[in-house]
From Swiss-Prot:
It comes from Prochlorococcus marinus (strain MIT 9515). Pfam families: Radical_SAM, TRAM_2, UPF0004. It catalyses: L-aspartate(89)-[ribosomal protein uS12]-hydrogen + (sulfur carrier)-SH + AH2 + 2 S-adenosyl-L-methionine = 3-methylsulfanyl-L-aspartate(89)-[ribosomal protein uS12]-hydrogen + (sulfur carrier)-H + 5'-deoxyadenosine + L-methionine + A + S-adenosyl-L-homocysteine + 2 H(+). The gene is rimO. It is found in: Cytoplasm. One of its GO terms (biological process) is tRNA modification. This is Ribosomal protein uS12 methylthiotransferase RimO. Its EC number is 2.8.4.4.
């Protein structure tokens, strides 16, 4: 992590802004591109109006993400900006995009963002650039410059890129390439650098975090990595995208034994019924769901469980959906995200028969969310009358502190909203941990009062 180059004085220097669409893995790519351009002397900022060049880092996971990406591209080309399209849409449509939107100046693939400065130089010379590798192979390490918003106290740390699985609904392996892990040494160096810069929470990400190390160490090595990360002086380390098969006894023990790895388990299970999971090309999962969830709850009573689900997958019958509802009632996840199946060309699910009508899929999603809201509200209410540790991230217009306890991941979960008994300057609390007494809870957020700064 580094701060922007403050020594750039040349008023003729090219101003570059970024527009980001998609997941946190895409965000890390954006931060690396910003760092690389900053290192080369470009004026990198957030002011899209003043920028001569706009890099749109796109998402192509589902149709709605592509639509949002295209809207942004056209918005900036219509404004006369020089637009560089990076990320998953560039990878996905490397032949079509430049033909369909000739105003685009360059494409940069998911395995080519390290070349952004060279691409920029060519664009400034008037070239139309297509810098998209057929198969992405690159993964950035701690040596690649990276700009992280200095107003934030949370950073994502990518431990691996790509995926070797072939889930029927997912196009990510085609967009991100095969799995390639960073070494433990490289990850520890970056984590230490982040901690030294004042980052309070590091979130480990990859496509399948529990598969970390399989490609370079010959076996999944997340437990070994967590043991080393527990020595880094950062208060919270959170793990996203853990799969059931990788949650071994050794991994769970690493969670238990660490003081800074929060007991938050993000498990994208997708479904509960064996028939649907088999159609999703995840046949191994159904037999593990129950045992893994029970094991986590038994061994770590304070564990927070999040999952993501897909409804409306081809062939999902009412009996399959009712099985999923029973599964949710039984296991009472703290947080649930629900997605309606999106048929993606290039995936095996695209040609599956027996598609579920959209109105049924919509109703199933609404049904799950209604059930989950009641579950989440009851679980949140258990915190009323207790004291929790909260990372304060901002102050509202009403002079309330807004932050998170370890029970909430940024962006996808709720917040802890705290009142204070006196007016304060932002720097008194923001970026710090406080102890808070929880007085009220709804289905999304916790509310309380600050007791003291930790």
């Amino acid at each position: 992590m580094k701060q922007s180059n403050k020594n750039v004085k040349d008023k003729n220097i090219t101003k570059v802004a970024f527009s980001h669409v998609g997941c946190e893995k895409n965000l890390v790519d954006t931060e690396h591109m910003q760092g690389l351009l900053d290192k080369e002397g470009y004026e990198v900022g957030n002011n899209l109006e003043d920028a001569k060049v706009v890099v749109v880092n796109t998402c192509s996971f589902i149709e709605t993400a592509r639509e949002e990406s295209i809207r942004k591209i056209l918005e900036f080309t219509d404004q006369g900006k020089q637009v560089i399209v990076a990320g998953c849409m560039a990878q996905h449509f490397k032949e079509e995009l430049l033909k369909e939107i000739p105003e685009i100046k360059a494409l940069v693939g998911t395995g080519d963002y390290q070349k952004i400065a060279k691409v920029m130089n060519r664009v400034e010379k008037g070239e139309i650039v297509n810098e998209v590798s057929k198969v992405p192979e690159f993964i950035a390490d701690e040596k690649i410059p990276r700009l992280i918003d200095q107003k934030k106290f949370v950073a994502y740390l990518r431990i691996a890129e790509g995926c070797d699985y072939n889930c029927a609904f997912c196009i990510i392996p085609k967009l991100r390439g095969p799995q390639r892990s960073r070494t433990i040494e490289s990850i520890i160096l970056e984590a230490t650098n982040l901690a030294n810069q004042g980052i309070q929470e590091i979130i480990l990400i990859s496509q399948i975090t529990t598969n970390y190390g399989q490609d370079i160490y010959g076996k999944p090595s997340l437990a070994r990595l967590l043991k080393e990360l527990s020595k880094v002086s950062v208060p919270w380390i959170r793990i996203h995208y853990a799969y059931p098969t990788g949650l071994t006894d050794e991994v769970i023990k690493a969670f238990k034994d660490s003081n800074n790895i929060v007991p938050y388990f993000d498990l994208p299970l997708q479904h509960s019924h064996s028939d649907v999971l088999k159609s999703m090309n995840r046949p191994w999962q159904a037999s593990l769901n129950e045992s893994i969830l029970s094991k986590i709850r038994d061994q770590i009573p304070s564990a927070v469980l999040r999952t993501s689900l897909i409804v409306g997958f081809p062939g999902e019958e009412q009996k399959h959906f009712l099985h999923l509802l029973d599964f949710l009632h039984k296991h009472k996840f703290d947080h649930v995200g629900v997605f309606i199946f999106s048929p993606e060309e290039g995936t095996s699910a695209f040609d599956l028969p027996n598609r579920v009508p959209s109105e049924i899929a919509d109703a199933r999603k609404d049904n799950i969310m209604s059930i989950q809201q009641n579950i989440s509200k009851k679980k949140n209410q258990l915190y009323v009358g207790t004291k929790v540790k909260v990372l304060v991230e901002k102050i509202s217009k009403n002079n309330e502190l807004i932050g998170r306890s370890y029970h909430f991941a940024p962006e996808i979960d709720g917040n802890v909203i705290l009142s204070i008994k006196k007016n304060v300057i932002e720097n008194n609390y923001v970026g710090k941990f406080v102890e808070a007494n929880i007085c009220f809870a709804d289905e999304y957020d916790l509310y309380g009062e600050v007791i003291n700064i930790l």
